[in-house]
């Protein structure tokens, strides 16, 4: 009896230790990557509409909180904001408020994570999601220029920015051109529901080319196979981003066919196939890959394989 109890205790401790080690590896997976590697030559997992846990079939895109996503290894976040009557920026997906505020819930979470894990870097994509543009610009500008936060921000974007220059900091990519003074880069030429080349401009006007696959609107769920094919074509393009190239790639694996099928229905099919297609054994720069429902088995497999691809020879 005593022997059985001892074995149970040992097994429990082993499971807890293994779990803790795995969690720590996900929290600091960038730690073992060389400072000299350009950020654009990494495979980086991200989430589409990262804060959208509410909204049902039409609007929910995630099943994990932002903190849970961070701990899983997600390093790119797609945050949609709307200026609210309480003079804060609320996180929205379309018309659905996600019960989160940028100033009090999101940015403090990101900066605290970076303080605790200074080997990591976050890429945060910001987009206005409805509401008054002037209020949005004013509130976001005030927040991003507050000296309380600016030490965590990468002020100027450049195409060949190195991981070592980004550790412990946030690189902002602004989908809108609404701020005169901003950290990071603004997007110019991002077409809706398309694969396209986008120009990233920093505050000094320096330009970088970003290849974006964001074809998300389909007529019916049976077209999920077409979405997978589109994703794989774009990932193949990223694969040929040789060491002397500084072209950036963002691939969105998210899609919808409303009113027939929403993001979760597509994610069930797309993530399963994508998890099989992204092979951790083959070293290649996949670029940034944005997925829905990161907490599912297939979602976690995609994230794990993207991370592991950075360490394969």
Label the predicted regions.
Residues 4-14:
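Sec-dependent N-terminal signal peptides
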Residues 15-19:
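N-terminal signal peptide c-region/cleavage motif recognized by signal peptidases
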Residues 20-76, 83-116, 121, 174, ...:
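Long, acidic (Asp/Glu-rich), low-complexity accessory segments flanking structured domains
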Residues 78, 89, 148-150:
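Structured catalytic-domain cores with a bias toward divalent-metal coordination
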Residues 81, 130-132, 297:
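A cross-family signal for N-terminal binding/gating loops and helix N-caps
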Residues 100-102, 143-158:
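Acidic, His- and aromatic-enriched active-site or binding-groove loops in soluble protein domains
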Residues 105-149:
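Catalytic cores of phosphodiester-bond-cleaving enzymes
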Residues 151-283:
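Surface-exposed substrate-engagement region within the catalytic domains
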């Amino acid at each position: 009896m005593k022997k059985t109890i001892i074995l149970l205790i040992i097994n429990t401790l082993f499971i807890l230790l293994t779990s803790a080690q795995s969690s720590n590896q996900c929290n600091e997976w960038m730690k073992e990557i060389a400072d000299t590697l350009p950020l654009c030559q990494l495979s980086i997992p991200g989430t589409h509409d990262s804060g959208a846990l509410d909204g049902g079939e039409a609007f929910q895109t995630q099943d994990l909180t932002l903190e849970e996503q961070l701990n899983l290894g997600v390093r790119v976040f797609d945050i949609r904001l709307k200026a609210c009557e309480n003079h804060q920026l609320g996180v929205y997906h379309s018309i659905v408020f996600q019960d989160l505020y940028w100033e009090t819930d999101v940015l403090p979470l990101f900066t605290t994570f970076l303080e605790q894990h200074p080997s990591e870097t976050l890429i945060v994509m910001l987009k206005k999601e409805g509401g008054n543009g002037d209020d949005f610009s004013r509130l976001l500008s005030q927040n991003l220029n507050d000296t309380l936060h600016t030490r965590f921000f990468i002020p100027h974007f450049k195409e060949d920015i190195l991981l070592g220059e980004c550790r412990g900091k946030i690189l902002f990519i602004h989908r809108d051109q609404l701020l005169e003074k901003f950290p990071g880069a603004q997007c110019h030429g991002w077409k809706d529901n398309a694969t396209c080349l986008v120009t990233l401009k920093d505050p000094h006007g320096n330009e970088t080319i970003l290849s974006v696959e964001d074809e998300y609107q389909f007529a019916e769920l049976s077209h999920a196979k077409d979405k997978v094919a589109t994703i794989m074509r774009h990932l193949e393009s990223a694969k040929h981003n040789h060491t002397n190239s500084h072209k950036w790639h963002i691939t969105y694996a998210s899609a919808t066919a409303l009113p027939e099928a929403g993001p979760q229905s597509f994610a069930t099919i797309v993530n399963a196939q994508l998890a099989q297609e992204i092979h951790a054994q083959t070293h290649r720069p996949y670029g940034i890959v944005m997925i829905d429902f990161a907490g599912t088995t297939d979602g976690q497999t995609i994230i794990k394989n993207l991370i592991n691809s950075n360490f394969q020879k």
